[in-house]
Amino acid sequence: METGRQYSMPSNLNNPILTEQSVLLLEDGFCFCSPEEKAFYPFSDFGVTPEDGIAEFLHQKSIVDDCQLVLFNSPSILIPSLNYDAKLVSNYWEPYASLAPTSELKSSNSTNGLVRFIYPQTKAISQKLPWINKIPAYALLYDRIIEYSQQDFNKQIYVHLFAGFFDLFITQGTRIIMANRFPHLNEEDFMYYLFYAAEQLQLSENSVKIYFLGEFDSFASYYEGVKNFQNDLHFMETSVSHLPISQDPVPFWNA
């Protein structure tokens, strides 16, 4: 078995996850990503609603097209396309989380057509940003993870760490066994949820590879914590961020 730090090298090594300039909608602000810049803007800087703040920013940048809004402020649920029924969208979502009165459920298809993503979107986004292409973050994460996962038919764990949360995908080939988001304040929180999920799925830490989406200074203690229990760590390399998490809350995401 391979041990120690490993770097995965599929065909898209170091390709950014974003293929066009994008606004990443977070809970407390947004990141603007383009090939030339990446910056975080707290909503408190605008003094208006999140949707108005984004609209104002894009107007100041004179961006009227060629931009996408990546919905990061909520995870998605994944439904196999063969089982998907558009009339049951609310039923799919109800056991997962409550839906705010200001939001509505949307769905979209994965690039490979295997799953449907169901996710909430505020009605104000549809009203105030009707022209911008909107996509759930899970759709882009899924595409990147499946590109790696389909090369190995053993079970694998993929971890996407960002400010305050981490997304956990457990896969086997092109099959998604689990996709969920968990909160974290420190490495202890992270370790608890990570190994709790692995235990629930009866995954032995020494029989499954763990992939981190990128390797970043802000999460160095998290990697070290996992290494105490699991040596077979892999990092999906992208542009490295050495900024504190307060300045780059989603370090894996670059254009």
Where are these regions (language model features)?
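Hydrophobic/aromatic-enriched cytosolic interaction surfaces used to assemble or bind macromolecules
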Residues: 1-255
